[in-house]
Amino acid sequence: MLGITVLAAILACASCCGNPAFPPNLSTRVVGGEDAVPNSWPWQVSLQYLKDDTWRHTCGGSLITTSHVLTAAHCINKDFTYRVGLGKYNLTVEDEEGSVYAEVDTIYVHEKWNRLFLWNDIAIIKLAEPVELSNTIQVACIPEEGSLLPQDYPCYVTGWGRLWTNGPIAEVLQQGLQPIVSHATCSRLDWWFIKVRKTMVCAGGDGVISACNGDSGGPLNCQAEDGSWQVHGIVSFGSSSGCNVHKKPVVFTRVSAYNDWINEKIQL
C-alpha cells in the first residue's frame, strides 16, 4: 500500500507538483531555443561530476520527490563522484540565490539498461538528504501509467546542453518547443525506424530546435489540461549527424512506461 500511495500522490496532487512559481514563457518556438525564464522549470537539476577538483555539468535530470531525481542511465558512470545542483539557472554562478547542491546517496540504474541499443535508458538518484522545496526548487509531476500524447502535442525540452552542434555548453538554462512525434511516424524507415521502441517517445525533428549534448537525462515537459507540468520523457539520444537534423527527432525514454519501476525505486 505504501508504494501505491507515494506514486499516487505524485500523480494526483497537481497543486503539489509541476506548478512553478515563475511561469515559463511559452510564446517562443537547447539548440535553436532560448533562455528560459529564471526558475520557471524548478524541477530541472544539473547532474555534475568531480574532475580535477572541479565540478562539471554532465547531464540534466528532474526532481520527482524531495529525495529523488529522474535521469538517464547513460549519464551514469559508476567510477564518478556526483552531486546534484537544484534551483540552478546560471551554471557559472556557484552560490546562486535559491540554489543548493545535494550529495548523492545511491544511484539506481535500470536493471535491463542496454548501452548498445539504448533500451531502458532510465536511472533514479537518491539524494543523501531530502531537499527543502521553495519557489526555486519544486518537484515535477509524473504522467499516469501508459499515458501517450498525440502527434504535435506541444512539449518543451530544457537543459544546459550545447547551444549548437559542437558548440559551447549553455551558461543559463535553455528551453525549446518540441512537439510530440507519434510512434507511427518516428518509426518510419526514413526517420528512426527500428531504433525506436514503444517504451520511447519522440519529439521535434524539424531540423531547427533540438536537445544536444549536455541535455541528456533532462525532462520533456508537457502541460496537462489542469495546467500542471508533467515529465513525459527523459532525453536519451539524437542523431550522430548533429543536434537538429530533419526527421531525426530527439528520442526520450517514455516515463509512463516505467511507473512501476520508478515506484519500486523510490521506496528503497
UniProtKB/Swiss-Prot annotation:
Enzyme Commission code(s) on record: 3.4.21.2
Coiled coil: none
Propeptide segment residues: 17-29
Record: glycosylation sites: 25, 90
Cited PROSITE patterns: TRYPSIN_DOM, TRYPSIN_HIS, TRYPSIN_SER
Keywords associated with the record: Disulfide bond, Glycoprotein, Hydrolase, Protease, Serine protease, Signal, Zymogen
Keyword NAD tagged: no
Record's keyword annotation contains Membrane: no
Signal peptide residues on this chain, from the entry's feature table: 1-16
Entry similarity comment: Belongs to the peptidase S1 family. Elastase subfamily.
Name used for this protein in its record: Chymotrypsin-C
This protein's encoding gene: Ctrc
